[in-house]
């Protein structure tokens, strides 16, 4: 038997971006062809897509760790790395995406809707893309950015039109089994139903869906019984049906007190909801009372006696039925269909939106801005936060001195050096950006404009003269040991001047 899973925690890791390539063009008769390193490929995204073929979150229960493909590294000859393959996870309609704080990020209600759960990292630039007038032959490239990695919570809220609520063993599962083709587990003992059941009810040429959730007891909002965990499946319902057991022999229970107790638990659940379904809160949702088990003579008499009192006290329609004997079902079906059709007309139209892109959090880490604050753990140290500097740190190969110099140029141009001076930083102060700590050595004097240095330049690219064939031949003979490096032949002084430029 398949397990019904309606809540899972996913551990997501999008693909990292590929690294840029450091390469110099090599071709016969084209010396010093310039940099031609390609860019790294973008890391693969993790995407949630709604499909009608999936009805539970069971697969994610057994495989909660998800990682997308990494982007390929760039290569020489201006060849960019391939993009990492996106990983698409299929989810059922009604899936709600929450962050670790429980805040709703997306409500996936329609087939075809997509949500980028984790974005892949950008690929690093190759040295060809880094070349500029001041830096004609970069000897470094940028590292690919890591993909997003975080946990998300998926909750499944059934898209049923009618929700059945009631005490354990009130006959909810029996009712849904005779009104639809659903085959729930049925038994004459409390908490027979341990998971929600869904069924499609046919009324002539019309249909509506019905959800049966595990029974509630007083104190469910405090965790008693099965608690209120399954009530998320009735949040989207157009009408709530109180299924009341009129044949119960439990002391202190009667149909009216049962309804009052259930309403108290629903009110406690409503107070914890923060979602607008467009149908109003649960207290405003239409109600119907179903007095079940009328096949028992004493129960039928009690139902007939209390029907008018219930209608006066609560103002809701009351139906007397027997799910076991299939008695009184047709009037109930038509009344439910009437309410559902009216609710469908009033329900807000869904936006024609096939893709939902998760927005980035808006705070001080906005693009182009940064903050400098004292480091509480290092005396005289500072911590720098900001979208750009933290991203640049991740892109830097700290084993390459030229790449480190390029990072220093960028930070200076962004204004971080001036910011450190204003914050009172001294030469040699410990500065931390994105988990990387280093000693601060200012590149410019106070008040000067930060100008990108000539790191990555190659003086050979500025030369207009080229060595002759004879000179290349002599250099080859020297390397092979056929002649002495200082042997310039006859007229040595003139030759020496020519060889040494």
Curated annotation (Swiss-Prot):
Keywords: Cytoplasm, GTP-binding, Hydrolase, Magnesium, Metal-binding, Nucleotide-binding. Pfam families: DUF1967 (PF09269), GTP1_OBG (PF01018), MMR_HSR1 (PF01926). SUPFAM superfamilies: Obg GTP-binding protein C-terminal domain, Obg GTP-binding protein N-terminal domain, P-loop containing nucleoside triphosphate hydrolases. GO terms for cellular component: cytoplasm. Gene3D superfamilies: GTP-binding protein OBG, C-terminal domain, GTP1/OBG domain, P-loop containing nucleotide triphosphate hydrolases. GTP binds at residues 166-173, 191-195, 212-215, 292-295, 322-324. Residues 362-442 form the OCT domain. Transmembrane segments: none annotated. Mg(2+) binds at residues 173, 193. Residues 160-341 form the OBG-type G domain. The keyword Hydrolase applies. Its EC number is 3.6.5.-. Residues 2-159 form the Obg domain. GO terms for biological process: ribosome biogenesis. GO terms for molecular function: GTP binding; GTPase activity; magnesium ion binding. Monomer. This is GTPase Obg.
